[in-house]
Amino acid sequence: MGCRYAVLALAVAYFAGSIAANDSQIVAVKGPASIRFTPAIHVVRGRFLRAANTADERNEDRGINLKSMPGFEKIASLFTKKNTPGPLLSWFEKKKSPDYVFLKLKINKGKQQLFDHPDWNVWVQYTTSVVKSDPEEAMIAALRTHYTDDILSKLLESAKNVPKTSGLATKMQMEHWVASKTPSQMFQFLRLDKVRNGVLDDPTLSIWINYMKLYNSKPVNKKQQVTLVSMLTTHYKDRGVLDIIEAAKKVPKTAPAARQLEMEQIQFWLKNGKSPDELLTVLSLDKAGNQLLASPRFKFWSKYVDNYNRDFPDEATTVMATLRNQLGDEDITPILIAAGKVPSTEKAAAKLQAEQFKSWLRENEDPAKVFQLLKLDNSADDLLGSPQFKLWGKYVEDLNLKPEHNDLQVSIITILRKNYGDDVLGNMVLAGKKAPSTSFMARRLEDELYKGWIAAGSSPDGVFKHLKFDKAGENVIQSPLWGLYTKFLEHYYKSFPTPMMSALAKGYDGDALAKLLIAAEKIPTSNTLATKLQTGQIQRWLDDKDQPGKIFKALLLDDMADDILTSPLFNTWTRYLDEFNKKFPDEKVSMTDTFRTSLDDETLKSLLITAKELPDMKTLSTKLQTVQIERWLASKTSPEDAFAVLALNKAGGNVLSKPLLNTWAAYLESFNAKFPRSRVSMIDTFREFFGDKALLTTLAAAKEVESTKKVATSLQDSLLSKWVLAKKPPSGVAKLVGTDEAGAKLLKTYTTKYMERYGQ
């Protein structure tokens, strides 16, 4: 029964407190802590004895003595004439709505401001007593039936500026907003949709958050709860919210709020079932390129993937699977490679790449494709040192270990040869051997290369071309790859014992090949093989029964002039000549025959000159001299011409010391014997080419040299005899021999001979 009079009791307490406070204008109001006070009402005092008595009678009937309540008498006097505590109790008993009481109290009438009405506090207290759950909401609902939203907003805003009414007005204003605006409208009303990255630092955000809390507290909104992140997403979209969070994180003041918002955003996405694939695009990570793993958003996204898998186990995925799905192996692979080179992202890249390789292995991805995805097809300079190459090699090994690949083994060298020329691979091997970090891999690659050539059926001449030796010319021996090739030949001929010269013979003409082998003999690493190959070359010629003269020309010895006898090719040819004569004794060929048929006079002369000057060529010199003499005799070459051919006419004072003088002397003797009617003397030839005066000087000098003294003396005697026969007077000779002691002596000798012959 006491409940029926609660409103009156509250009114009594309310006004009793007002009186007890004497002149105080503030009375306590039930409400949240944020709104602790509401202004007292100013009323016209009057008498309401009847109302008081009526109430008294009713209270007595119900066992409640209102008069016994402190201050009741004075409270009753505060009501207007019509609005006594009696009617208030009656309204309460009949459960009249706050709107009904509002009209009865005529608060919307009069000249006073709403909050200054004499019965405003009575109505507030009545509403608070009647509506226990949310009295402010009930007040606003009642007020909205009597005022437009604009007018009501102005009234509330005006009341907020008055200290005695600001508390309640603020609370009611919030209720008014909740009643009149949707969360989105309120967000726009506060212009928070225009702030963008600075929204978390905007003072008005706290107003909206209080609004949001009040809005969410309403039972009617239980199923449509609003959050800050949902509202930000509505107005700024996902990417805009991300920008807001990232900007706020950089400011110490807003960093905590940003981190909290970030967590709420994750939960918001999870609640809405946003997949990692969708979020990857939202975060623009699909366009991050090589900066993907370094992006703070990537770490954020990675955490989201974990949370997503927890909440949606049936749709669980991995970071790598999503990246491959969104970017494709073609794009993500180079990103991981680049990230692996940066210390800050190296570990993350290695982890993701390990997942990628597992995926490839599970899918039986073609190693050749993986090779290209890893950009190994364009890494010749540092392939063996590349971490990616090692990973790829391990992948091939793991793939080959799978049972389904027992009959489909993948060859590393086959893939390498498809992407790089053998010459490039060879250079990789050589370079790799020099570095400790790659030497093991280089040796392994070298063995694989040999095996690959043999397995592919590559012949020596094929490998010769693969290594580009067919374009190296005579410099092939200088190629760093030469040792690699010779080693291959050793491997090859162990498996296929065929003539070793086939490859070289197809790649080079006879002379070039011979030069090649001779050069190879001088290189320690290929000396032994070169000797074998040279033997093989000679054997090849013998098998073909090539004439020595043909080989002589094939080796271009007939074009070497002065260099024939000093050329290593000449030794090769002489070896072949000996082997030919042994194998075909009935068809023996002499060296002189070859010289005779292969060399012209000029070349033979040069050859003869060279042979005369080389100590170890005495026998050959004799043979060459014979050939030369026979050729001159056959053509009836005059001794004078032969003298000139041998360039003795240009020897000047050194003519008697020239080895070729002996050759010419031998020819002169043979010529005179064969053609006695055309006999030529040595002295006549000397006189013809040098003249008497110059000849005398030459002979005089030669007589002082032991090796030429004899021939010089003989020629001098012949010259004197020629003068005697020509009746050259001593006086004329005196002009030639000079006045020195040697000249005087020679003149005396001549005069004696002259006198003996002519007696004058």
From Swiss-Prot:
Q: Where in the cell is it found?
A: Secreted; Host cell
Keyword Signal, does the record have it? yes
Principal place where this protein is found? secreted
The LWY repeat boundaries are 135-221, 222-312, 313-403, 404-496, 497-584, 585-760
Q: Which GO terms describe its cellular component?
A: extracellular region; host cell
Induction remark: The expression is highest in the biotrophic phase of the pathogen.
Question: Which segments carry the region annotation 7 X 93 AA tandem repeats?
Answer: 87-760
Q: Where are the WY repeats?
A: 87-134
Q: Where is the signal peptide?
A: 1-21
Asked if the keyword Repeat belongs to this entry, the reply reads yes
A Pfam family assignment? PexRD54_WY
Q: Where is this motif: RxLR-dEER?
A: 47-62
Which superkingdom, per the lineage? Answer: Eukaryota
Identify the InterPro entries for this entry: PexRD54_WY
Keyword annotations from UniProtKB, A to Z: Repeat, Secreted, Signal, Virulence
Reproduce the free-text note on domains from the UniProt record.
The RxLR-dEER motif acts to carry the protein into the host cell cytoplasm through binding to cell surface phosphatidylinositol-3-phosphate. The C-terminal region (residues 87 to 760) consists of seven imperfect tandem repeats, including one W-Y motif (WY1) and six L-W-Y motifs (LWY2 to LWY7). WY1 forms a 3 alpha-helix fold with one hydrophobic core and each L-W-Y motif forms a highly conserved fold consisting of 5 alpha-helices. The units contribute differently to the virulence since WY1, LWY2 and LWY6 are important for the ability to suppress the biogenesis of small RNA in host and virulence activity of the pathogen, whereas LWY3, LWY4, LWY5 and LWY7 are dispensable for PSR2 function.
Q: How does it assemble?
A: Interacts with host dsRNA-binding protein DRB4.
Function noted in UniProt: Secreted effector that possesses RNA silencing suppression activity by inhibiting the biogenesis of small RNAs in the host plant to promote enhanced susceptibility of host to the pathogen during infection. Interferes with secondary siRNA production by associating with host dsRNA-binding protein DRB4. Inhibits the host salicylic acid pathway during infection.
Which family does this protein fall into? Answer: Belongs to the RxLR effector family.
Q: What is this protein called?
A: RxLR effector protein PSR2
Species annotation: Phytophthora infestans (strain T30-4) (Potato late blight agent)
* Source organism phylogeny: Eukaryota, Sar, Stramenopiles, Oomycota, Peronosporales
